[in-house]
């Protein structure tokens, strides 16, 4: 793993979710409290996967890259956000934390074409169009290149996604997670996420404050 400290953190929410999700708010609150010097960004993603990634790439255009000395970025993604985070990590070479990540998003969301409401604001609706399935397929990562760059938090109790697919995708060649946990229970939302937040932030290798 690279030893360059992380100075910028991106959080990507899941399908029908928002920056107001419980996990996103927990991370944002902890970053503001303990790591105020770190740049933290959690955007509201549009329904179109192509537009979502175009917007993210614009947002992070001036963030540290692989060639930036002494600084690095990292990404956290939940569910569909984990799918996006994986694509972004492969594009940029950054560290990634994936929380019950979608592995076959195009397949899984092909049944979700139509109108939906946000989990956190039922009055906020959006249309998930058929062409978005192909946009998801274009972002697929058949195999991650460096498992050591990923921390995966996977719940066997996930009622939405197949934990075995997640484990197979993020494990090393011996079938084990180099970083992360396979939870025996929990659920898709990872309701016990506060129990693992410190571990997640430790993995990110956040830059220590100048006064610390």
Question: Where are these predicted regions, by residue range?
Answer:
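Glycine-rich phosphate-binding loop signature in dinucleotide/nucleotide-binding domains
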Residues: 3-4, 63-71, 145-146, 206-211
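Active-site catalytic motif of lipid deacylating hydrolases and related acyltransferases
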Residues: 5-69, 187
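Structural motif
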Residues: 8, 72-74, 95
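Short hydrophobic segments within beta-strands
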Residues: 10-15, 76, 153-155
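A structural signal for short coil/turn segments at secondary-structure junctions
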Residues: 35, 67-68, 92, 173-175
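Gly/Ala-rich beta-loop-alpha elbow adjacent to hydrolase catalytic centers
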Residues: 76-81, 85
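Active-site signature of alpha/beta-hydrolase-fold catalytic machinery across serine-
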Residues: 87, 91
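The alpha/beta-hydrolase serine catalytic core
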Residues: 94-212
């Amino acid at each position: 793993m690279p030893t360059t400290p992380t100075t910028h953190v991106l959080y990507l929410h899941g399908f029908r979710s928002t920056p107001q999700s419980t996990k996103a708010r927990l991370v944002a609150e902890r970053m503001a409290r303990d790591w105020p010097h770190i740049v933290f960004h959690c955007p509201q993603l549009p329904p179109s996967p192509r537009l979502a990634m175009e917007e993210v790439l614009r947002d992070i255009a001036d963030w540290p890259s692989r060639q930036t000395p002494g600084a690095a970025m990292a990404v956290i993604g939940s569910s569909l956000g984990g799918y996006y985070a994986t694509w972004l990590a492969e594009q940029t070479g950054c560290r990634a934390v994936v929380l019950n990540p979608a592995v076959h998003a195009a397949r899984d969301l092909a049944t979700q074409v139509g109108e939906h409401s946000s989990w956190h604001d039922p009055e906020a609706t959006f249309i998930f169009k058929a062409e978005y399935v192909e946009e998801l397929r274009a972002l697929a990562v058949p195999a991650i290149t460096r498992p050591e760059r990923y921390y995966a938090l996977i719940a066997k109790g996930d009622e939405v996604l197949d934990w075995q697919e997640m484990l197979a995708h993020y494990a090393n060649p011996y079938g084990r997670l180099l970083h992360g946990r396979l939870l025996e229970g929990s659920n898709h939302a990872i309701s016990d996420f506060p129990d693992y937040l410190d571990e997640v932030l430790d993995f990110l290798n956040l830059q220590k404050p100048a006064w610390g």
